[in-house]
Amino acid sequence: MTDLPDSTRWQLWIVAFGFFMQSLDTTIVNTALPSMAQSLGESPLHMHMVIVSYVLTVAVMLPASGWLADKVGVRNIFFTAIVLFTLGSLFCALSGTLNELLLARALQGVGGAMMVPVGRLTVMKIVPREQYMAAMTFVTLPGQVGPLLGPALGGLLVEYASWHWIFLINIPVGIIGAIATLMLMPNYTMQTRRFDLSGFLLLAVGMAVLTLALDGSKGTGLSPLAIAGLVAVGVVALVLYLLHARNNNRALFSLKLFRTRTFSLGLAGSFAGRIGSGMLPFMTPVFLQIGLGFSPFHAGLMMIPMVLGSMGMKRIVVQVVNRFGYRRVLVATTLGLSLVTLLFMTTALLGWYYVLPFVLFLQGMVNSTRFSSMNTLTLKDLPDNLASSGNSLLSMIMQLSMSIGVTIAGLLLGLFGSQHVSIDSGTTQTVFMYTWLSMALIIALPAFIFARVPNDTHQNVAISRRKRSAQ
């Protein structure tokens, strides 16, 4: 990229800045949840909604982000995304109740949903095709650093300042990013087809109400009748979308995608697989602090080996898949992740704390291999005219399944424990043990889906390109 104009390089830095903000926020909050609960006067069992409100909003808003960027312009939407994300961060820091915090996190999610896909679109507009891969590698690198710094930085801020600072640090960064976007980024637009508003609303309602219904009386305090009503509304909304999308060329996501068997299997496996693995980044720091008595900073440091293991495997996952094939790799990594989850629980409860970093490093390696394999399996055989739509649907499913995973983790904690789980409670470790055993079972279940992948699905010439497109 050395031959790119200075203006283009600055524009790439702005996009990288946005990627860093969004990725940092996905991990920095996890370590602070027990402290937030204490400050807001809430049970730690309710705090999973702080993550769910953000991730679910991202899932709901993702389908609209690309269309808005094409219609209104990439600069205008990227600027709006940064402003909304920054305002959401300010309101999070000012929140005095859990409900206020959840609303502020949802506002953050609207900005986060637009930031990454619009950033990818911006790179496509400003960089020549032959340099697109190098440019995307450059702008996504800060996005890989964010999860590495997030847990430790979150723990450090909570321990030596307060949880409010995990949001306040976004404000100066956001202001600089917004000003730089207005000054340096071109406002590319293009012809767009009519937005499928009906399909968007049906999907949004279906995803949101079913997730709320899943949280149930333990998290939302709803009556059984209200929960049944939410389930009915969600199911009806999704069925109506299927009827709406059938033979509709303007549908948000074409049902033709599911004619490709590897896409159908990959999407189903990604949805089920990320429900299980989505529990881990939430549950691990909560368990370390509430179950084992770690300080926030110590718990944050313990998350770093997991991220390092994940980053290290990305270099060799192509060779692994090409050598053994998708079915073997996905079944093995799914069952392996379940076993590593049990190993983490066992070593932690036995007090072998010096072993935990190695177990978490192994967990990161296995999880990264599975993620990359799921992403590329899902997209690799799609025809070119459906690749963009398939990638958008996969991105939405990734966020939705993560929000469901965190919701189920909170539900399991509420099922096995009281509303007053604390470090001083004698039953706390038992509650976490049952929760961890249930998680290991949920993580293993997608192996049945991956076992249906054709055994000869291993030719993977374009895996590295497709893999990055799905991250």
Swiss-Prot record:
It is found in: Cell inner membrane. One of its GO terms (molecular function) is transmembrane transporter activity. The keyword Cytoplasm does not apply. It comes from the Bacteria. Keywords: Cell inner membrane, Cell membrane, Membrane, Transmembrane, Transmembrane helix, Transport. Residues 33-48, 98-101, 159-164, 218-224, 284-285, 363-395, 452-471 are cytoplasmic. It is a multi-pass membrane protein. Residues 1-11, 70-76, 125-137, 186-196, 246-262, 307-341, 417-430 are periplasmic. InterPro entries: EmrB-like, MFS, MFS_dom, MFS_trans_sf, Multi-R_MdtD. One of its GO terms (cellular component) is plasma membrane. Its main location: membrane. The chain crosses the membrane at residues 12-32, 49-69, 77-97, 102-124, 138-158, 165-185, 197-217, 225-245, 263-283, 286-306, 342-362, 396-416, 431-451. The keyword Transport applies. HAMAP family: MFS_MdtD (MF_01577). Belongs to the major facilitator superfamily. TCR/Tet family. This is Putative multidrug resistance protein MdtD. The gene is mdtD.
